[in-house]
Swiss-Prot record:
GO terms for biological process: translation. This is Large ribosomal subunit protein eL40. GO terms for molecular function: structural constituent of ribosome. The keyword Signal does not apply. One of its GO terms (cellular component) is ribonucleoprotein complex. Signal peptide: none annotated. Belongs to the eukaryotic ribosomal protein eL40 family.
Amino acid sequence: IIEPSLKALASKFNCDKMICRKCYVRCPRRTPQRTCRVLTWIPQARLPPRATNCRKRKCGHTNHVRPKKKLK
């Protein structure tokens, strides 16, 4: 059982984020092959909750951001 204050603090740092749509699409998919090169994961831009633009240069600092999906 988690205290409500600790749960709010944890969700602030882990769940209350914005995700860049362009950076998220460009991430490679995980495939069941055994090569390490395929399984490398490029992190998408996880932005602060009030972000309006992405911080990454690869997507051109786009303003296509969405809220991170909530846990069930």
